[in-house]
Amino acid sequence: MSSAARHHCSGLRERLGCVQCSFCATVLLVSVPCSSVLRVVAVQCGHCSGILSAVNLPPSPVSASIELTPQELDAGPPPGEYSDESSGDDREGRDAEDDAPAPAAAAVANKPPGRKQRTPSAYNCFVKEEIKRIKSMEPNITHKQAFSTAAKNWAHLPRIQQKRGRDSC
């Protein structure tokens, strides 16, 4: 994006900038109200629902139009405009440790909701317990061999035992 998107807020209500999602690499066009006193704003990606932070820098003294060409939108965020990392007031006085990305705990908490976990089937419960039993009797057996034996034991199991309680393993 060129200086056409960076404009002074006098007379305008918002500033525009680009943020690249760190989860799915989608480039997002962000408008920040000029009245915002926050240095960092939260942005939610419409593609993956990931939440990232955009550094809200003070308005540049350049006054220009807000029109963006398609090439400017595809160019990605310019240096110093918006970033998905936390940053201080100026880039020159930063230490190397400040360049570290945001904590990984925030990335884990912002994942889109996954599918609901289903109750394991009777077969899965039986095989899981049977593998534990077989490995306790023969600790040197490979998992593949234990699984094969457990599957054979399931095949020879009377059907009455298979239909017992539907509680999870």
From Swiss-Prot:
Compartments, record wording: Nucleus
Family annotation (InterPro entries): HMG_box_dom_sf (IPR036910), YABBY (IPR006780), YABBY_C (IPR056775), YABBY_N (IPR056776)
Zinc finger residue ranges, C4-type: 21-48
Superkingdom per UniProt: Eukaryota
Region of interest (Disordered), residue spans: 63-122
Gene3D superfamilies assigned: High mobility group box domain
An annotated GO cellular component: nucleus
Keyword annotations of the record: Metal-binding, Nucleus, Zinc, Zinc-finger
Biological processes per GO annotation: cell fate commitment; plant ovule development; polarity specification of adaxial/abaxial axis
Known tissue expression: Expressed in leaf sheaths and flowers.
SUPFAM superfamilies, alphabetized: HMG-box
GO molecular function, one term: zinc ion binding
UniProt cross-references to PANTHER family, sorted A to Z: AXIAL REGULATOR YABBY 4, PROTEIN YABBY 6-RELATED
Similarity annotation: Belongs to the YABBY family.
Name of this chain's protein: Protein YABBY 7
